[in-house]
Each structure stands twice: as structure tokens, then as C-alpha cells.
């Protein structure tokens, strides 16, 4: 591979970053995958697979491993960031001075900025300036299924139409990976943050033993909370009926591959927050997202009762069953009301 002709540099060699890199490489593109731990990258290069997360998926020959950040960023103008939301801003500030003058950046990170609750687009603009084209991909994607080449569909939104078209062409694979463009940059970002919160709630409900009826009601009312918050931020309500909204919400709330759902189930079964996090063993994005989404809702005056009760369980020591009963005991109202 010529040092500067890769189609994409992927920043983040966890399960999802690796799965996206494999998908791009399988599409016939030269891809560079960078990770912050040189030993981990050396292991990936030696094994030609990510044995920790995706042990049965060999790397295509066009997937190249790199532990030097400057070299990785020089390889392509297109940069795909796949890191946890709480380090997103830090990573962008780290890569900014090393990016090519013609760089364009897309992220698959789901969530909001830690502590502030800001959308990641605002974090990116602050870190990178106003000139770099930005994009986000989001939707119902478990890394194992994506890497295995099972059929998957996502949404893509960008600040730049040319970048959006190029990304859609790079990512789209008629055999297994369908990419829908969407002009709603805010909505595509927001869905991925709120669904993490609701998935914890769905897990709690199942952990308590409330059954399928309760889980479905929670998903439906969670979608209403997502839509209300989106409307307050200027998103298109139709976005939340698509891949980045309802699609991701249903997947994360109903399948045990979801760390957020499994975390919630443990809480519903009586485990404390710290023990549940330790048992999961990987980042539970919804834990931080709950605090961030709640802050965003308060800032915009949006009532989100499910999010509030999950926050009370995670940060204030409330019992999961008690939180569920609080929701069930709320005053009667019109299903279409704004609160």
C-alpha cells in the first residue's frame, strides 16, 4: 500500500472499530486501523484477527494495522473515529495537528459529551474548526454480526453532501451492508445516545421479570422521549422512525448482545451498579449517557420520565423495581401529549 492512498483510516481498534475496518476492507478498499495500545496492535497484526472481540473473523489482506498515529493519519484523507463518547473530544484534539490538509472526519461513536451533554458535532467543531467536513454513521449494528458479513443497515448524515456521497459509496455493500443517507445531522446523532439509556431500562424491566408487554411499552414510550428531545433540538421527527432511531432502539433493547441491556438486567435482578459494570467488563455507554441525556433534557425543558427514573437508579441508589412502580404510578394522560 502506498503510504497516502488508503480509502479510510479507522481510529479505534475495539470490537466496533475493527468490525467497520473489516467491512470496508472486505469491500475492496485499502484500510488502516489504528489503536492506542501498540501491544494490542502488534497482536492483531500477528494473529490477523481480533481474537479478543471477533475471534472467528480473519482480516482481509487490504486491512493494515498501525500503532503510529501520525502514519495512520497520513494514510488517508478520510478518518473514521470509533471510540467511547467520554474520550471523543480528547481523541479529536490529539489527531487535529496530525491530520492532512484535505482531511474529512466521520464518527461511529454513539453518545454525548461527558459532563456537558453536548452533541458530538459541537465537540468536533470546537476541536477541529469549521472547515473540516463532518459526518456520523449510526444504526442497529452489533459488531459480531457486522464483521461476520450478516445483513446490516445504518443511517449516514453529513455537513457536506460530497462527503456523504463518498462515504455512502465506500461503505455500501449490496451483499450485506446497506447505508441510508439522511440530511438530519442532529437526529442521527441523538438517537444513538438516547437508545442506550432506554436499553438499560428495558434490561431492568426484564431483570425484574415484568415480561414482554412491559418491555414493549417501555420501548414505545422511550421512542416518544427520544422524539420529544429531538424536536426540542431541531431534529426531524421522521429520523427517529429510521435506522438511527427506532432501528437501533429495538435492537439494543431486545438482544442480549447489548451491553446496556445486560447491564440493566443485572440491576433489575438486584445487583449494584458497580458490580454490574465490572461483570460486563467493557464500556457501558448508557451509564454515562443517562446523566448526559438527562442534563440535555433539563436544559431544553423536555420531560423524560423513563430517563429520570433510570438516572435515579444509576446515580441515586433507587431500587429498579421502585423506579418501575414510580413510572407505572404516573398520572393518566393522552398518549400523544408532550410530557
Curated annotation (Swiss-Prot):
Which cystines does this chain contain?
none
Q: How does activity depend on pH?
A: Optimum pH is 7.0-7.4. At pH 6.0 and pH 8.6, the observed maximum velocities are half the optimum velocities.
Q: Where does it primarily localize?
A: cytoplasm
Metabolic or biological pathway: Membrane lipid metabolism; glycerophospholipid metabolism
Q: Which GO terms describe its biological process?
A: carbohydrate metabolic process; glycerol-3-phosphate biosynthetic process; glycerol-3-phosphate catabolic process; glycerol-3-phosphate metabolic process; glycerophospholipid biosynthetic process
Q: Where does NADPH bind?
A: 15-16, 36, 110, 143, 259, 283, 285
Q: Which residues form the active site?
A: 195 (proton acceptor)
Pfam families associated with the record: NAD_Gly3P_dh_C, NAD_Gly3P_dh_N
Binding-site residues, sn-glycerol 3-phosphate: 110, 139, 141, 195, 248, 258-260
Q: What is its EC number?
A: 1.1.1.94
The record's annotation in InterPro entries points to: 6-PGluconate_DH-like_C_sf (IPR008927), 6PGD_dom2 (IPR013328), G3P_DH_NAD-dep (IPR006168), G3P_DH_NAD-dep_C (IPR006109), G3P_DH_NAD-dep_N (IPR011128), NAD(P)-bd_dom_sf (IPR036291)
Q: What are this entry's molecular-function GO terms?
A: glycerol-3-phosphate dehydrogenase [NAD(P)+] activity; NAD binding; protein homodimerization activity
Which keywords does UniProt give here?
Answer: Cytoplasm, Lipid biosynthesis, Lipid metabolism, NAD, NADP, Oxidoreductase, Phospholipid biosynthesis, Phospholipid metabolism
Explain what switches its activity on or off, per the activity regulation comment. Is allosterically inhibited by G3P, the product of the reaction.
The protein's matches in PROSITE patterns, at most eight in alphabetical order, are given as: NAD_G3PDH
Q: Which PANTHER family match?
A: GLYCEROL-3-PHOSPHATE DEHYDROGENASE, GLYCEROL-3-PHOSPHATE DEHYDROGENASE [NAD(+)] 2, CHLOROPLASTIC
Q: What is this protein for, i.e. what is its function?
A: Catalyzes the reduction of the glycolytic intermediate dihydroxyacetone phosphate (DHAP) to sn-glycerol 3-phosphate (G3P), the key precursor for phospholipid synthesis. Is able to use both NADPH and NADH with similar efficiency. Can also catalyze the reverse reaction in vitro.
- Give the quaternary structure: Homodimer.
Q: Which family does it belong to?
A: Belongs to the NAD-dependent glycerol-3-phosphate dehydrogenase family.
Q: What is this protein called?
A: Glycerol-3-phosphate dehydrogenase [NAD(P)+]
Name the source organism: Escherichia coli (strain K12)
Amino acid at each position: 500500500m502506498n503510504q497516502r492512498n488508503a480509502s479510510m483510516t479507522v481510529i479505534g481498534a475495539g470490537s466496533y472499530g475493527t468490525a467497520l475496518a473489516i467491512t470496508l476492507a472486505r469491500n475492496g478498499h485499502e484500510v488502516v486501523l489504528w489503536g492506542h495500545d501498540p501491544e494490542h496492535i502488534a497482536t492483531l497484526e500477528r494473529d490477523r484477527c481480533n481474537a479478543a472481540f471477533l475471534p472467528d473473523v480473519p482480516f482481509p489482506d487490504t486491512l493494515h494495522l498501525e500503532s503510529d498515529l501520525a502514519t495512520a493519519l497520513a494514510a488517508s484523507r478520510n478518518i473514521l473515529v470509533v471510540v467511547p463518547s467520554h474520550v471523543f473530544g480528547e481523541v479529536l484534539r490529539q489527531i487535529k495537528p496530525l491530520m492532512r490538509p484535505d482531511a474529512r472526519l466521520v464518527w461511529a461513536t454513539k453518545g454525548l459529551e461527558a459532563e456537558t451533554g453536548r452533541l458530538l458535532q459541537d465537540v468536533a467543531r470546537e476541536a477541529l474548526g469549521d472547515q473540516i467536513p463532518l459526518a456520523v454513521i449510526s444504526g442497529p449494528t452489533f459488531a459480531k454480526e457486522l464483521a461476520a458479513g450478516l445483513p446490516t443497515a445504518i443511517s449516514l448524515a453529513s455537513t457536506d453532501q460530497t462527503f456523504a456521497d463518498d462515504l455512502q459509496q465506500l461503505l455500501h455493500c449490496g451483499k450485506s451492508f446497506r447505508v441510508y443517507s439522511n440530511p438530519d445531522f442532529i437526529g442521527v446523532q441523538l438517537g444513538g445516545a438516547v437508545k442506550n439509556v432506554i436499553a438499560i431500562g428495558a434490561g431492568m424491566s426484564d431483570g425484574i421479570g415484568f415480561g414482554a408487554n412491559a418491555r414493549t411499552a417501555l420501548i414505545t414510550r422511550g421512542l416518544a422521549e427520544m422524539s420529544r428531545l429531538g424536536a426540542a433540538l431541531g431534529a426531524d421527527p421522521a429520523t427517529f422512525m429510521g435506522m438511527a432511531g427506532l432501528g437501533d432502539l429495538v435492537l439494543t433493547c431486545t438482544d442480549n448482545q447489548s451491553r446496556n441491556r445486560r447491564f440493566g438486567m443485572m440491576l433489575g435482578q438486584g445487583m449494584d451498579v458497580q458490580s454490574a459494570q465490572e461483570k460486563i467488563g467493557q464500556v457501558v455507554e448508557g451509564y454515562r449517557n443517562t446523566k448526559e441525556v438527562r442534563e440535555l433534557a433539563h436544559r431544553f425543558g423536555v420531560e423524560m420520565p423513563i430517563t429520570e427514573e433510570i438516572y435515579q437508579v444509576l446515580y441515586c441508589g433507587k431500587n429498579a423495581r421502585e423506579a418501575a412502580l414510580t413510572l407505572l404510578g404516573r398520572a393518566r394522560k393522552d398518549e400523544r401529549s408532550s410530557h
